[in-house]
Amino acid sequence: MGSMLLASFPGASSITTGGSCLRSKQYAKNYDASSYVTTSWYKKRKIQKEHCAAIFSKHNLKQHYKVNEGGSTSNTSKECEKKYVVNAISEQSFEYEPQTRDPESIWDSVNDALDIFYKFCRPYAMFTIVLGATFKSLVAVEKLSDLSLAFFIGWLQVVVAVICIHIFGVGLNQLCDIEIDKINKPDLPLASGKLSFRNVVIITASSLILGLGFAWIVDSWPLFWTVFISCMVASAYNVDLPLLRWKKYPVLTAINFIADVAVTRSLGFFLHMQTCVFKRPTTFPRPLIFCTAIVSIYAIVIALFKDIPDMEGDEKFGIQSLSLRLGPKRVFWICVSLLEMTYGVTILVGATSPILWSKIITVLGHAVLASVLWYHAKSVDLTSNVVLHSFYMFIWKLHTAEYFLIPLFR
């Protein structure tokens, strides 16, 4: 009988039996006839079982069960007395302690995520690109009355499109160059492990879908084709497939930058404002031609100069940049000379402007840029990657300043 009752009690781990019972048949008969297990005993037993189960599942208890079975049998009473003692020792408190998250820790997590995304987007380039899109849109402005609500809505559409293009480009570049960036740019989120490969794929694909979808929704074919062509050119530059990976070849690199930044975006953003916002016929005014020409030179310079600080990683992975072929010093002075010649030509062209204020601003503005560039170039240490990278950032600043002058050329 003791073994039967113990088998029906699953929580017991060690049982000590004290006393004796009749053999199974006689005991079963007497048990059916006179049982001392009352209804209250069953309830108590059920509560004990549920309590033990809760302890096991929620509090990781170390449980010790001690079951003392004692009883006596006689011919007259034929009784069995049982006593069950359950001792549970918990390593944790039974009281529920709610875990509250510190608002400061939540804010720190959000701030860290935004900082990682900020670095992922390469803000120095994004700022210049957004500013460039703004001033390329201003090229379509012919009179002050054009600066209306419709213009600002069209400008916002251009900004959304160019941000999507930029995020797709930097995301694809980091995905395709992750091993190179571990050498050249180890602080980038993907190369440093702060962003996972999967997350960067999601961000990159989402930016492409959002850019194309947005251009489709606003019903602007110039904007749609600008997003599409820019993303395809970025793919040709980065993706390592046959006939692609143009970044391996200096000439194709320059063509890539000119086709994307100078031609596609300049024409696309201008035509979006001209035909979709102002509802005017397609034209190619003098400021647009000037914008395309000067931005093309900047695109070539940036394409060539960006490889100077990255020579170590490029050489290891077989990218034959112009810096590796000619040496960093020659490429450095080629870039500086290209910009100086561009400023000189721009000064001459600006002097022919029929509008006095445009003539003065164009000539003086580019004379200042040429002087500042030459002053900084003479003090650059060509053996220091840190200094070269700093000068590369300086070229981006010159590029940004140029965008302020482009809309004023008439």
Curated annotation (Swiss-Prot):
Enzyme Commission numbers on file: 2.5.1.70
Subcellular locations according to the entry: Plastid, Chloroplast membrane
GO molecular function, one term: prenyltransferase activity
Main location: plastid
Induction: Up-regulated by elicitor, methyl jasmonate and salicylic acid.
TM spans (from-to): 124-144, 150-170, 195-217, 222-239, 251-271, 288-308, 331-351, 355-375, 386-406
Tissue and organ expression note: Secifically expressed in root bark. Not detected in aerial tissues.
Cofactor: Mg(2+); Mn(2+)
Temperature-dependence annotation: Optimum temperature is 75 degrees Celsius.
Disulfide-bond pairs as recorded: none
Top-rank lineage group of the source organism: Eukaryota
Alphabetized Pfam families for the sequence: UbiA
Membrane topology (UniProt): Multi-pass membrane protein
Keywords for the protein's UniProt record, in alphabetical order: Chloroplast, Membrane, Plastid, Transferase, Transit peptide, Transmembrane, Transmembrane helix
Enzyme superclass (EC): transferase
A GO CC term assigned to this protein in UniProt: chloroplast membrane
Xref: InterPro entries: AtHST-like, UbiA_prenyltransferase, UbiA_sf
PANTHER family assigned: HOMOGENTISATE PHYTYLTRANSFERASE 1, CHLOROPLASTIC (PTHR43009:SF6), HOMOGENTISATE SOLANESYLTRANSFERASE, CHLOROPLASTIC (PTHR43009)
Function per UniProt: Involved in the biosynthesis of sophoraflavanone G (SFG). Can use flavanones (naringenin, liquiritigenin and hesperetin) as substrates, but not flavonols or isoflavones. Shows a strict specificity for dimethylallyl diphosphate.
Family stated for the protein in its record: Belongs to the UbiA prenyltransferase family.
Protein name in UniProt: Naringenin 8-dimethylallyltransferase 1, chloroplastic
